[in-house]
């Protein structure tokens, strides 16, 4: 395991773009879309840098971690907010930032007629940042924060043209149905904490052999429900068709 200080920039860049565009208001209308696209592309560049560094190390040393801060410290339960980049997550980092940047570029022209384009690009940046946290978090709690962030960003993007009742209804439907999957993930985290005393990926992996089959089965079922909700699998797939009500770039992103 290798330590790094640059992983946080993968998330911080698009997150800063979302914050600046939302807080900057109309002052960012003329150039906000360009800034959002540049920050998404910059995050992709950081991902390429991390990939190049990873390829230069042995297989055992390729995973990279970064501790951000102590998040929860209650009795014997301690959770550090941290990031973990390995061979699997780097593939998703490059997919999220690479395809996300292309969608940003396409949206510059597609949304050029919209007077509220700045807000749209802020939500795009927010989606990218949340998705990156989802794949980079080193614990189930970090994953959960990113998971909920993706749900919020999806709701905001699907219902972007909320002056049309059908679009507003579609975003609400997606948001509510995804809550079923969210409950599955939250119950899986509770099972992990109750039976293993940890919610970090490394800690859970270490405790698997000492955990009952019933607890592992329950946790697995809850994670399956979570995945079904988020990826629109049966029987939680009904929201996906309505999600196409959002602007075309949103459909591509989701």
Q: Where are the language model's segments positioned?
A:
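...captures the hydrophobic TM-helix bundle architecture rather than a specific catalytic motif
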Residues: 1-254
């Amino acid at each position: 395991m290798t330590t790094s200080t640059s992983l946080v920039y993968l998330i911080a860049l698009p997150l800063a773009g979302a914050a600046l565009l939302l807080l900057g208001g109309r002052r960012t209308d003329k150039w906000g879309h360009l800034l959002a696209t540049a920050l998404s592309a910059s995050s992709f560049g950081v991902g390429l840098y991390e990939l190049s560094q990873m390829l230069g190390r042995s297989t055992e040393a390729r995973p990279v971690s970064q501790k951000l801060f102590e998040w929860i410290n209650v009795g014997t339960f301690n959770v550090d907010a941290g990031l973990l980049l390995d061979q699997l997550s780097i593939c998703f980092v490059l997919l999220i930032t690479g395809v996300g940047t292309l969608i940003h570029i396409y949206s510059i022209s597609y949304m050029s007629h919209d007077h509220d384009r700045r807000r749209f690009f802020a939500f795009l940046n927010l989606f990218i940042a949340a998705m990156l946290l989802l794949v980079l978090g080193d614990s189930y709690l970090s994953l959960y924060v990113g998971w909920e962030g993706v749900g919020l960003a999806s709701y905001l993007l699907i219902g972007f043209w909320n002056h049309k009742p059908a679009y507003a209804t579609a975003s609400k439907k997606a948001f509510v149905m995804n809550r079923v999957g969210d409950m599955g993930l939250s119950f899986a985290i509770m099972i992990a904490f109750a039976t293993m005393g940890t919610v970090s990926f490394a800690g859970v992996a270490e405790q698997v052999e000492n955990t009952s089959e019933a607890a592992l089965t329950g946790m697995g079922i809850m994670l399956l429900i979570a995945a079904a909700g988020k990826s629109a699998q049966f029987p939680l797939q009904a929201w996906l068709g309505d999600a196409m009500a959002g602007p075309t770039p949103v459909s591509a992103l989701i």
